[in-house]
């Protein structure tokens, strides 16, 4: 099946995020009533959120746009089930992270297939990154460390460390208990901290950034 990419908003156009609870309430009314343009409005309001979650979870690569499109298509098909305005954002985040976890599993299965069949390894996706060579190298190394996490721990790590969600929010988004969310976050953080401390490039980069920030 050919991937579908949504092009509601030109890449150079400014996003218009929902700024108030009233905005989300008005959007939910539009969704429930099936008003014209609610899909475009949702895309414009939440594209930055979804794109950021996918990017932070999987690293910068050529498939990000396709995955973002998948998320919004699933959202468009099921958004009518939402009953509370406060749930619009968390519902979309939940769809995003479920899609990310499926993609993580797909990639791991693909790597195993290449390993056992003796074929060539899958082509490494093009990685975009910052202009600073050190920052780009650090991003690649960190992405590799995050890649080592299983799909569930990775999702918890991204939501906690990169999105700043608390354990209650993480549990709601991932559909798990508070204790399970806490356990996944702790396990992921311990893994990342341990691996970063053993990575000379990352350790030096973080030290330099800290010195510049405090200087």
Predicted features by range, described:
Residues 12, 21-24, 110-135, 139, ...:
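Internal acidic/polar
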Residues 22, 29-52:
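A short, charge-rich alpha-helical start-of-domain segment used by transcription regulators
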Residues 33-36, 125-158, 163-173:
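Amphipathic alpha-helical segment used for protein-protein interaction
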